[in-house]
Amino acid sequence: SDVCSSDLIRLDDNDRVVEILSNDYRIGEQNLAMNIYVIERESLIHLIHDASVRGLVYFERDILARNLKLLNVHAYRFDGYVARVSDMKSYFDENMRLLQEGSMDALFGPAPIYTKIRDDNPTRYLEGSSVKNSLLADGCVIEGSVENSVLFRGCKIKKGAVVKNCVLMQDTVVEPNCNVEYVVTDKNVHITEDKKLTGTDTFPVFVAKGHSV
């Protein structure tokens, strides 16, 4: 379903894009667009302005596809790990997929991906803590139980708290004796003591940035 909702592209023998097909349901091997583009700033501004005065709003369909004969648009082949994140469900699913064997290696490979750096202490696992099949960034403090979850940097899981099948973003705090399952939190979320939050794999609970529940 994700493939069908993406753009397909047709190329000539020189990898020049000659056609963009939006929401096309063709079967078989196809060239799937990743919707990543490198373009000169002034050219982009000109194209957006021209589309705006005409009431056009979609970049691929209304700007690129309409100007393929005028623009020199080429494709670069990428055979690595690709995930389409378009809503909360797909965001949750793709994070959970990182916990599967081989997914991390497929994503990063031998070449590192450099992101914003915030040097922090290594994650601390205190006495009585339990962590299974999870991916934790640095700066976390774990006193409770974490299973099948992705924790961003600086998360704190207090004593007696149980976290399962969750994606917890930066500096999320789960207080003692909480039980959270199938939950996605934004940054700086505070889950108060003895709280129970339970979603499902098809409809995870989302807690917005900075909220306390």
What are the language-model segments listed below?
Residues E42, D50-V213:
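Left-handed beta-helix
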Residues R10, V38-E40, R84:
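Short, well-ordered beta-strand micro-motif
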Residues N35-H46:
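Conserved nucleotide-sugar donor-binding
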Residues L8, I36-V38, P204-F206:
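Conserved hydrophobic/aromatic beta-strand scaffold that supports enzyme active sites
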Residues D2-S5:
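Short, small-residue-biased leader/transition segments that mark boundaries at the very start
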Residues I9-L11, A75:
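A structural signal for short hydrophobic beta-strand segments in well-ordered beta-sheet cores
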Residues L11-G28:
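Short, flexible, basic/aromatic active-site loop/helix in glycosyltransferases
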Residues R26-I36, D79:
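A short glycine-threonine-serine/GTX helix/turn-capping micro-motif
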